[in-house]
């Protein structure tokens, strides 16, 4: 594996928008019983649905441990590649590499030198004191392993960052949240301006928009932006919304809406904000919590916990939107309607049973990682 010195922008790289063409999608395979209920059997069915749906539009590689490889291979469609890569859990948005690309700069450039991956530091969303589990040693190797398998050059970075904490428009703008990136459990030695400088140097952006907070109840990640809002095109965002003024989410949504109304992107465009209503609220049931093996190795899953359920947490595939469906028919149907109107040239595919993913802290965007086409 080639390790590149200096920063991605020094070499002419930038992070493309998620709607730009992909060569494939990377997904993990859930198995840990202290996070996924009933030994992850329900989650594995939903991960299989997600992988199968995405594989209609682009190649998919699923990474499973040696103990789970055969099980994953048997459940997944034959055309989905399954490779043996172990991880502590299956959140590939956060433990997978952030891919960056550059335009061809000389005749000597070949394809493999037009894409690279960023190997951010990972600390299980908060380290030993606040993180979701106490051993993340396997997660820390996933980026290196994927880049090695694909023979893609690697940039390493000592800054703690997860892929779900950033969104880019591919034209110079990044959105993140202060709740996550300025949390003392990530990079307490770095100031806001220093973190912003690193984002610019590694993602190739010129402007960083800081939302104060993420989705209410998204305590595992400390408010990742990918549960709160996302770009749908340059100058336009989808924002998690609620009309219920008694819901604590209302204040957060209004706060973000107000911010987007007062700023412009890197190219001076005002933002169009499209509201996407959250489901529920949804809460973990006694039965669901009882199915999680509680030990000292991971955060407990307790009955009555509000689930960080958001329709913004979808995946943009080549020509498709792979969107969560939580079993709340009113808002499930509304989400499909809004997404279909927002992405008129994409097929919107709803994944039934997405509640199984959010029970463990994330959703479809959190379990996927796109690899750009070059």
UniProtKB/Swiss-Prot annotation:
Pathway: Amine and polyamine biosynthesis; putrescine biosynthesis via agmatine pathway; N-carbamoylputrescine from agmatine: step 1/1
GO MF: agmatine deiminase activity; protein-arginine deiminase activity
Alphabetized InterPro entries for the sequence: Agmatine_deiminase, Peptidyl-Arg-deiminase_porph
Catalytic activity: agmatine + H2O = N-carbamoylputrescine + NH4(+)
GO biological process: putrescine biosynthetic process from arginine
Active site, UniProt feature: 366 (amidino-cysteine intermediate)
The organism's place on the tree of life at top rank: Eukaryota
Keywords: Hydrolase, Polyamine biosynthesis
Documented EC number(s): 3.5.3.12
Residues at which agmatine binds: 220, 226
Similarity section: Belongs to the agmatine deiminase family.
Function: Mediates the hydrolysis of agmatine into N-carbamoylputrescine in the arginine decarboxylase (ADC) pathway of putrescine biosynthesis, a basic polyamine.
Complexes and interactors: Forms homodimers.
NCBIfam families: agmatine_aguA, PRK13551.1
Protein name in UniProt: Agmatine deiminase
């Amino acid at each position: 594996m080639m390790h590149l010195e200096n920063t991605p922008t020094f070499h002419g790289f930038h992070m493309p928008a998620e709607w730009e063409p992909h060569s494939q999608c990377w997904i993990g395979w859930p198995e840990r019983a202290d996070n996924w209920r009933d030994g992850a059997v329900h989650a594995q069915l939903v991960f299989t649905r997600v992988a199968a749906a995405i594989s209609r539009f682009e190649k998919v590689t699923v990474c499973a441990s040696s103990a789970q490889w055969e099980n994953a291979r048997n459940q997944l469609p034959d055309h989905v590649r399954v490779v043996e890569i172990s991880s502590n859990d299956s959140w590939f948005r956060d433990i997978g590499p952030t891919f960056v690309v550059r335009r061809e700069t000389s005749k000597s450039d070949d394809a493999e030198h037009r894409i690279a991956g960023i190997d951010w530091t990972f600390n299980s969303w908060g380290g030993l004191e606040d993180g979701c589990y106490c051993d993340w040693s396997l997660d820390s190797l996933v980026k290196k392993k994927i880049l090695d398998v694909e023979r893609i050059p690697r940039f390493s970075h000592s800054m703690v960052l997860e892929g779900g904490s950033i969104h880019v428009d591919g034209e110079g703008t990044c959105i993140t949240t202060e709740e996550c990136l300025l949390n003392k459990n990530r990079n307490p030695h770095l100031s806001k301006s220093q973190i912003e400088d690193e984002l610019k140097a590694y993602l190739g952006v010129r402007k960083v928009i800081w939302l104060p907070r993420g989705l209410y109840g998204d305590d595992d990640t400390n408010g990742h932006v990918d549960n709160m809002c996302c770009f749908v095109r340059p100058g336009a965002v989808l924002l998690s919304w609620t009309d219920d003024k008694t819901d604590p989410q209302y204040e957060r949504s209004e706060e973000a809406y107000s911010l987007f109304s007062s700023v412009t992107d890197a190219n001076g465009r005002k933002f169009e904000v499209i509201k996407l209503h959250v489901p529920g609220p949804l809460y973990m049931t006694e039965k669901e919590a009882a199915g999680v093996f509680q030990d000292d190795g991971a955060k407990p899953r307790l009955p009555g916990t509000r689930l960080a359920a958001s329709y913004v947490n979808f995946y943009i595939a080549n020509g498709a939107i792979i969107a969560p469906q939580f079993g709340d028919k009113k808002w499930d149907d509304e989400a499909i309607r809004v997404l279909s109107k927002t992405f008129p040239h994409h097929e919107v595919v709803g994944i039934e049973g997405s509640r199984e993913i959010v029970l463990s802290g994330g959703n479809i965007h959190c379990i996927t990682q796109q690899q750009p086409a070059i």
